[in-house]
């Protein structure tokens, strides 16, 4: 039996390319500082082609932020459920997050812009659909900590 090439979904590949190229734009300039025209130019698409993939800038922005966050979430979640005491896991989590922020400048800037965003609808979508699992995992770890015990 001959080998068969696995066909990829061209729309999915293009969406991934758009995320990869638009996230640094949002990281540098924030939501308000990036236009769909800027993204289309960076990606090498027409605006019409960009709108084929995303209904509006909100959808693109939220999808790009989600993609960037999820790309890093697995490593952080592994730390939270790894071996060790709750204090040790919390320390490794904070260290890992700090290292991530120190070495991935675009991700750091994107997180800063997300935190500064005053649009309640976007904040709500991100909190409920992107950050919720991580918030719950950190909360669960915190609930394991003995408040009467010093970490050291």
Residue spans of the language-model regions?
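Amphipathic alpha-helical segments used for helix-helix packing
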Residues: 102-125
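Hydrophobic alpha-helical connector segments
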Residues: 63, 77-103, 137, 146-151
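Short coil/turn segments at alpha/beta junctions that flank glycine-rich nucleotide-binding fingerprints
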Residues: 28-32, 83, 104
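Helix-turn-helix
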Residues: 6, 17, 21, 25-59, ...
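Amphipathic, well-ordered alpha-helical segments in soluble domains
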Residues: 44, 60, 68-72, 103, ...
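Short, structured helix-loop boundary elements
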Residues: 15-16, 36, 58, 62, ...
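Short, intrinsically disordered or compositionally biased N-terminal tails of bacterial proteins
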Residues: 1-5
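Amphipathic alpha-helical packing segments from all-alpha helical-bundle domains
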Residues: 70-78, 92, 120-146
């Amino acid at each position: 039996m001959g080998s068969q090439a696995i066909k990829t979904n061209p729309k999915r590949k293009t969406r991934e390319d758009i995320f990869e190229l638009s996230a640094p734009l949002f990281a540098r300039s924030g939501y308000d500082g990036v236009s769909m025209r800027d993204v289309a130019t960076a990606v090498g698409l027409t605006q019409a082609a960009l709108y084929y993939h995303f209904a509006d800038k909100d959808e693109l922005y939220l999808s790009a932020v989600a993609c960037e966050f999820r790309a890093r979430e697995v490593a952080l979640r592994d730390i939270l459920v790894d071996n060790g005491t709750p204090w040790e896991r919390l320390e490794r989590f904070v260290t890992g997050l700090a290292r991530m922020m120190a070495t991935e400048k675009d991700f750091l800037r994107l997180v800063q812009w997300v935190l500064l965003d005053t649009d309640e609808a976007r904040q709500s979508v991100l909190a409920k659909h992107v950050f919720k699992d991580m918030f719950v995992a950190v909360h669960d770890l915190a609930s394991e900590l003995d408040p009467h015990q010093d970490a050291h």
